[in-house]
Amino acid sequence: MDRRRMALRPGSRRPTAFFFHSRWLVPNLLAFFLGLSGAGPIHLPMPWPNGRRHRVLDPHTQLSTHEAPGRWKPVAPRTMKACPQVLLEW
């Protein structure tokens, strides 16, 4: 392609060129998201280390393998043991 045709003329700038400029990208995105949230702080969901992947199974507790696959069985909640809580750092 011809470089002269690819170059933007002074009067023919794209309207989004200012928004995506590298120096103004972060402030413009921040203003955009603050406008969406009603000019308040943005609270993004944070993962909390209490999911299944963070649980450590007791080696003496075995899962029952004699059940049919695909069957769901309700499990009683575990009782609280007197052990120190460990804080997982991310």
From Swiss-Prot:
Expressed in which tissues: Highly expressed in prostate and testis. Also detected in placenta, muscle, colon, peripheral blood leukocytes and skin.
Highest taxon listed in the record's lineage: Eukaryota
The UniProt record lists the keyword Nucleus: yes
Keywords: Nucleus
Compartments (UniProt record): Nucleus
Subcellular location, principal: nucleus
GO annotation, cellular component aspect: nucleus
Protein name per its UniProtKB record: Protein PRAC2
The encoding gene: PRAC2
